[in-house]
């Protein structure tokens, strides 16, 4: 438990302190956000705000994980390392995208093909990796089975199809958080709650772990490294919480694709290694809602030849154009996220109670 608390504290302090320095450095270099012309007109005032703040989150999380293990003299686990690879790998792709926007002074970053290839490489290596590296009990970080609260036995896929499923989950999750990151503090605050939920969930799995002699066979959880996954989850939650100090309206820095792609990938990674892939739809409901709003808007527009369901997508922009203040939209969306996270954890716990 010590390394869990230590990781959360170090990552939070890291972003609280590090982000301030990073803002000054970016401002001195003149590296700021470019605003798309087709966005809400109220966002024009945000032009020039420093971006790539996700870099501070990534560095703080990696540092926190390292410090937690060095201080407690414990070994890192393959499950945690794979999630951190997914987190930092997608973050690096996002960093290249942000850097291209800044250096070329345009609102569009990497070419779609290059960005997709980079994301695919990171996702594929993670998806393959989680299917290997069994522990002494034969449990691998991930599983070919689609999971809800545990692996679903009748949805056990061939390994190759399981890999495809994980890749699709990563693609959907990373882009969902990216779409949500459109208002000051929205994605950061929501991510804090989601990773906080995965911290609680992983700690519970560790306490009811099949590899513990006292819980084996008693409706336990067949996962590989739940304690270390909790270390990663709280490190990310802590980093997001600290970053929110600078990212809340009026934002002094944005996550950028560096942060949103990294956080989205890590959410998917958490779901895979904790065997809660379909539960992610509930815990991350806000991200799902935002994504569905875009899909619905585009589909209806194409089918009807120009009609729209919303004033603008993603959904948070729709409410902005209806006259809601940005802070109002963010807080109400946070409330939705909090309710969804609570519902997800409630379902997770209720299933365990029902099995006793």
Curated annotation (Swiss-Prot):
A single cellular component GO annotation: plasma membrane
UniProt subcellular location: Cell membrane
GO biological process: cell division; cell wall organization; peptidoglycan biosynthetic process; regulation of cell shape
The keyword Magnesium belongs to this UniProt entry's keyword annotation: yes
Enzyme class: transferase
Catalytic activity: UDP-N-acetyl-alpha-D-muramoyl-L-alanyl-gamma-D-glutamyl-meso-2,6-diaminopimeloyl-D-alanyl-D-alanine + di-trans,octa-cis-undecaprenyl phosphate = di-trans,octa-cis-undecaprenyl diphospho-N-acetyl-alpha-D-muramoyl-L-alanyl-D-glutamyl-meso-2,6-diaminopimeloyl-D-alanyl-D-alanine + UMP
Keyword annotations of the record: Cell cycle, Cell division, Cell membrane, Cell shape, Cell wall biogenesis/degradation, Magnesium, Membrane, Metal-binding, Peptidoglycan synthesis, Transferase, Transmembrane, Transmembrane helix
UniProt GO molecular function: metal ion binding; phospho-N-acetylmuramoyl-pentapeptide-transferase activity; UDP-N-acetylmuramoyl-L-alanyl-D-glutamyl-meso-2,6-diaminopimelyl-D-alanyl-D-alanine:undecaprenyl-phosphate transferase activity
Entry keyword Metal-binding: yes
Known pathway: Cell wall biogenesis; peptidoglycan biosynthesis
Membrane topology: Multi-pass membrane protein
EC number: 2.7.8.13
TM helices/strands, residue ranges: 4-24, 53-73, 76-96, 116-136, 152-172, 186-206, 228-248, 253-273, 278-298, 333-353
Cofactors named for this entry: Mg(2+)
Function in brief: Catalyzes the initial step of the lipid cycle reactions in the biosynthesis of the cell wall peptidoglycan: transfers peptidoglycan precursor phospho-MurNAc-pentapeptide from UDP-MurNAc-pentapeptide onto the lipid carrier undecaprenyl phosphate, yielding undecaprenyl-pyrophosphoryl-MurNAc-pentapeptide, known as lipid I.
HAMAP family for the chain: MraY
Family: Belongs to the glycosyltransferase 4 family. MraY subfamily.
The name this protein goes by in its record: Phospho-N-acetylmuramoyl-pentapeptide-transferase
